[in-house]
């Protein structure tokens, strides 16, 4: 009897321990599951996700992508591969794929400090060409975007790109948390318009911190990047969403809306490369004839995400020859580099002219730079027209550097 009671006592102890600590924050499991459930703000239409899961279970090739900023790239934990996106990839393979899950492929297209606008320029190359046309994609820019109309339009363009290339692509909208908030208020109407499943971390994290469910240090490493436990929480929320979609009664397939949620649209962005093969684009590089080897790097490769670019030659004898581009477009995005503070090469200001009119001056050497990307929409029209764009160093910066990281346009 004593042995039986001892065994029973050990069993009860283990059950209680599992209830208290089977989650990253070591809190009551029921409370944790309620937190997870609260992050699911909309299940959207489940038809696309059900098809993806059916393909995974059948052993068919399935391509998963994640597009976002530093949280998606894996910032926070000691190892970036402990980020939520990598955890999600491992979890969905383990739960739904046969065998070792080798039929499921993953491409993490996260890049620190970047938002939806640059995402439109990166999408075709960094998501599709580096990986493949996704069957499932997570889009996460809620703590990087500033919430203005341009970011809302860019977010919609990314959703549209994924669905147009593959109408059966399951797009998941993920809104990360930060101590300064997020832009889920601007993104949720777009996601609702496309019937997307959505997870919002912010309200639940804020509520949990307010009620001392866990400490700030348990979730955040700083003001935005989660701890490994925070990333695990995000993964659990995404997996709970997938499980809910899997178990629910099948919805009728959702058609891609004929119109757009917000116009003018930024959909259909084409990236321009220095080895330009686009007959619509004519470029004279002027003094921007060098290649910058210090542009932003990807954690997954430790190499530049923009190895091809246009760097202004630092030369006291430079004649300040402008970068000149002629093209037909509706929208044009210019991305320049914020030179790392303290770098021996000093960067300066460049003026941007469109059809002879100065539209902006950008400072590539402003304080706080870390070789980061600075995207700006410099042409924004409803109808395509022919334009001439000039970029040249501003007075006083003729001897300094400036890097055009990349360009993107729509027709």
Language model features with spans:
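Structural recognition of the beta-strand scaffold that forms the well-ordered cores
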Residues: 63-67, 72, 105-110, 135-141, ...
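Solvent-exposed loop/turn segments at secondary-structure junctions
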Residues: 70-73, 111-116, 142-148, 177-181, ...
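Alpha-helical scaffolding within the catalytic cores
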Residues: 44-53, 89, 116-130, 152-161, ...
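N-terminal secretory targeting modules
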Residues: 1-67, 72-79, 90, 94-103, ...
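Oxyanion-hole/transition-state-stabilizing segment in secreted/luminal serine hydrolases
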Residues: 65-67, 72-73, 99, 116-152
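Contiguous mid-protein beta-loop-alpha structural module that forms a pocket-lining wall or clamp
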Residues: 161, 165-257
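Soluble non-cytosolic domains of exported or imported proteins
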Residues: 62, 78-83, 113-117, 121, ...
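Post-signal peptide N-terminal segment of secreted/secretory-pathway proteins
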Residues: 89, 95, 103-105, 136-141, ...
């Amino acid at each position: 009897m004593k042995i039986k009671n001892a065994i029973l006592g050990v069993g009860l102890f283990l059950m209680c321990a599992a209830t208290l600590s089977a989650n990253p924050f070591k809190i009551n499991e029921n409370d944790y599951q309620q937190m997870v459930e609260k992050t699911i703000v909309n299940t959207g239409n489940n038809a696309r996700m059900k098809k993806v899961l059916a393909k995974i279970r059948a052993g068919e090739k399935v391509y998963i992508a994640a597009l976002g900023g530093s949280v998606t790239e894996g910032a926070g934990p000691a190892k970036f591969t402990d980020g939520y996106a990598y955890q999600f990839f491992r979890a969905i393979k383990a739960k739904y794929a046969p065998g070792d899950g080798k039929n499921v492929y993953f491409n993490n297209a996260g890049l620190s400090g970047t938002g939806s606008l640059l995402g439109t320029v990166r999408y075709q190359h960094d998501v599709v060409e580096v990986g493949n046309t996704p069957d499932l994609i997570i889009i996460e820019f809620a703590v990087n975007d500033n919430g203005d109309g341009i970011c809302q339009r860019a977010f919609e363009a990314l959703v549209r790109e994924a669905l147009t290339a593959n109408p059966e692509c399951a797009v998941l909208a993920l809104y990360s948390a930060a101590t300064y908030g997020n832009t889920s208020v601007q993104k949720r109407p777009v996601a609702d318009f496309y019937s997307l499943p959505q997870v919002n971390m912010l309200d639940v994290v804020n509520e949990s911190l307010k009620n001392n469910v866990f400490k700030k240090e348990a979730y955040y490493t700083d003001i935005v990047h989660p701890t490994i436990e925070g990333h695990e929480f995000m993964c659990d929320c995404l997996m709970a969403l997938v499980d809910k979609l899997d178990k629910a009664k099948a919805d009728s397939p959702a058609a891609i809306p004929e119109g757009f949620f917000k116009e003018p649209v930024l959909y259909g962005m084409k990236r321009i490369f220095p080895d330009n093969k686009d007959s619509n684009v004519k470029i004279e590089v002027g003094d921007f004839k060098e290649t910058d080897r210090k542009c932003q790097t990807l954690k997954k490769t430790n190499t530049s995400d923009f190895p091809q670019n246009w760097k202004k030659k630092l030369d006291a004898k430079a004649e300040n020859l402008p970068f000149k581009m002629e093209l037909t477009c509706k929208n044009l995005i210019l991305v320049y580099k914020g030179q790392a503070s303290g770098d021996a090469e000093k960067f300066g200001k460049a003026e941007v002219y469109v059809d002879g009119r100065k539209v902006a001056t950008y400072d590539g050497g402003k304080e706080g730079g870390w070789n980061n990307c600075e995207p700006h929409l410099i042409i924004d029209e409803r109808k395509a027209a022919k334009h001439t764009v000039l970029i040249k160093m501003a007075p006083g910066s003729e001897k300094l550097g400036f890097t055009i990281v990349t360009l993107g346009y729509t027709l």
